[in-house]
Amino acid sequence: RQMCIRDRDTTQRDTTRKKSFLDDIISGKNQDSLYYDVRNRTVYIYNQGDINYQNMNLKGDFMRVNMDEKIIYAHGKRDTIDGKPTVTNPTFTEGAANPYTMDTITYNIGSKKAKIKGVATQEGDGWLIGNNVKKMDDNTIHIQDGKYTTCDQTDHPHFYLAMTKAKVIPGKKVVTGPAYLVLE
């Protein structure tokens, strides 16, 4: 007696839909142009870009969205009008938190964490200003080389509490490392 064995593929084809890298839709608009680099899966947005994703909003004059890394990068624009330098900086808002104005931001859509350079945001009756800031997924922010002031001039405050490092829980408290008062 002979046995016949057929080669059969026992694995079945996966019919489940592949999960998108996003949990929701990114919507946006811009004043000038939008360029999509298909090879690198990166979108470049120029001039007054405005991106919304879930409860996050980011506005800036230049933005780069990397689909593979789930990263949005934004920076401001320096311009000269009538010989006076004009700066338009990105603004970032998440949920009901106060907006952040900054020089640059690198925001991870997946983890909801961000690295921010040159940030200013209103906290209580004053302003928190930081050179190097990390925003965590629970909206706490870690500031290195920070300032807290009630002076209206956030670019160059006349007086401030200088903080070598700080942790901010928005709407609740600010915990600092070594801090000292500066009067100019």
Predicted regions and their residues:
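Short, small-residue-biased leader/transition segments that mark boundaries at the very start
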Residues: 1-5
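Structural signature for solvent-exposed beta-strand/loop edge elements and short helix-capping sites
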Residues: 6-184
